[in-house]
Amino acid sequence: MLDSKLVRTQLTEIAERLATRGFALDVARFEALESQRKSVQVRTEQLQAERNSRSKSIGQAKARGEDIAPLLAEVDQMGSDLEAGKRELDAIQNELDNLLLNIPNLPHESVPVGADEDGNVEVARWGTPRSFDFEIKDHVALGEQHGWLDFETAAKLSGARFALLRGPIARLHRALAQFMINLHTGEHGYEEAYTPYLVQAPALQGTGQLPKFEEDLFKIRREDQADLYLIPTAEVSLTNIVAGEILDAKQLPLKFVAHTPCFRSEAGASGRDTRGMIRQHQFDKVEMVQIVEPSKSFEALEGMTAHAERVLQLLELPYRKLALCTGDMGFSAVKTYDLEVWVPSQDKYREISSCSNCGDFQARRMQARYRNPETGKPELVHTLNGSGLAVGRTLVAVLENYQQADGSIRVPEVLKPYMGGIEVIG
């Protein structure tokens, strides 16, 4: 959430910056609500002061032996008016808060301006796509050839956009997740966490999925308790570890990593990537989250992105790194890098990781703070999140890039210890 004071004092500039994201801030609505808020607040404060004065007069009149009944009635009426004013003020403030909750973050000045993914800027490439001397197969054909990948049974169980993995491919999927977790904890300094897969609404509001993107979530309604949501990413549960906390500066940075399933309705993806494992309702992801001091968040973003890149490099998968433009960034991000891995059957790069600096946007929603050692006062932390990596899409990339003419798959060198030394599957 943006700082309400910043929005009030720099409304025009904020609206212009948000316009580069394709977001039209309702300036007139904000100004009208802000005007109402000020008017009601002034009226309420004046009424409170007047009531306090009248209350003092009651004691003085009583001491003089005067009839205080009229004064008591007047003070009672003022009390009723004051309560009504406070309710009106709360209603206006709730509208303002709801307006602010639906406003995306401001892009950093270093973010390229663009309307959509066509405006993204390629920063770097690593590796060279392999040249095949045989007709390549996509991951679906490779998986189904050996009976490892079963979409028909998955559809019988759960409907479209689910996959059933069996045998060596299921083991390879597990190997990838274990390799990623071990790399991030062993070499990159992250603390592994096992988190709930079901969270309440405030957690999703804290990281920015609610209220704006509820249609993308799977919701579990409960009659006698708060509704629960399946996490769309471990970013939600990991980042909310610090919700409502005031951290000691010595605790920072906090670096968490978790391997979890992720659940997304893909409400806006009708007709896209309907074949295979690229876009699923349920998929596994290894997620990195960092909680840092404000001055260190952009440095942390570069480091986190490098951690995700290291996974691809060790797997020897060609990829490219993109700086997302203003119109393609996620709701909560100040700046984002995407990593796209080479998918031979599609003859193009596909997203496999997104690493974002969210600044104090999520922290303000969560009230996550640290005590600044220089001032002794609580200040908002900065939060970052990144995929390290999406396990299913990494599996797709390994299957297709490591395929052989007979449909068998070479096991990447770094995965052999997790595969019992097996060099080829199929």
Swiss-Prot record:
Gene Ontology CC annotation, any one: cytoplasm
UniProt-listed InterPro entries = aa-tRNA-synt_IIb (IPR002314), aa-tRNA-synth_II (IPR006195), aa-tRNA-synth_II/BPL/LPL (IPR045864), Ser-tRNA-ligase_type_1 (IPR002317), Ser-tRNA-synth_1_N (IPR015866), SerRS_1_N_sf (IPR042103), SerRS_core (IPR033729), tRNA-bd_arm (IPR010978)
Q: Which cysteine pairs are covalently linked by disulfides here?
A: none
Per UniProt, where does L-serine bind? 233-235, 287, 387
Gene3D superfamilies to which the protein is assigned, alphabetical: Bira Bifunctional Protein, Domain 2, Serine-tRNA synthetase, tRNA binding domain
Q: Which residues bind ATP?
A: 264-266, 351-354
Task: Recite the UniProt keywords alphabetically.
Answer: Aminoacyl-tRNA synthetase, ATP-binding, Cytoplasm, Ligase, Nucleotide-binding, Protein biosynthesis
Q: Where in the cell is it found?
A: Cytoplasm
Q: Name one GO biological process term.
A: selenocysteine biosynthetic process
Supply the enzyme class, top level. Answer: ligase
Q: What is its EC number?
A: 6.1.1.11
Has UniProt tagged this entry with the keyword Aminoacyl-tRNA synthetase? yes
The Swiss-Prot or TrEMBL record annotates one GO molecular function as: serine-tRNA ligase activity
Per the UniProt record, which residue ranges are transmembrane? none
- Catalysed reactions, as listed in the record: tRNA(Ser) + L-serine + ATP = L-seryl-tRNA(Ser) + AMP + diphosphate + H(+); tRNA(Sec) + L-serine + ATP = L-seryl-tRNA(Sec) + AMP + diphosphate + H(+)
Which pathway does the database say it acts in? Aminoacyl-tRNA biosynthesis; selenocysteinyl-tRNA(Sec) biosynthesis; L-seryl-tRNA(Sec) from L-serine and tRNA(Sec): step 1/1
The function of this protein is: Catalyzes the attachment of serine to tRNA(Ser). Is also able to aminoacylate tRNA(Sec) with serine, to form the misacylated tRNA L-seryl-tRNA(Sec), which will be further converted into selenocysteinyl-tRNA(Sec).
User: What NCBIfam families does its record include?
Assistant: serS
Note what the entry says on domains. Answer: Consists of two distinct domains, a catalytic core and a N-terminal extension that is involved in tRNA binding.
Could you give the subunit structure recorded for this chain? Answer: Homodimer. The tRNA molecule binds across the dimer.
Family affiliation: Belongs to the class-II aminoacyl-tRNA synthetase family. Type-1 seryl-tRNA synthetase subfamily.
- The protein, known as: Serine--tRNA ligase
Which species is this UniProt entry from?
Answer: Ectopseudomonas mendocina (strain ymp)
Gene name for this UniProt entry: serS
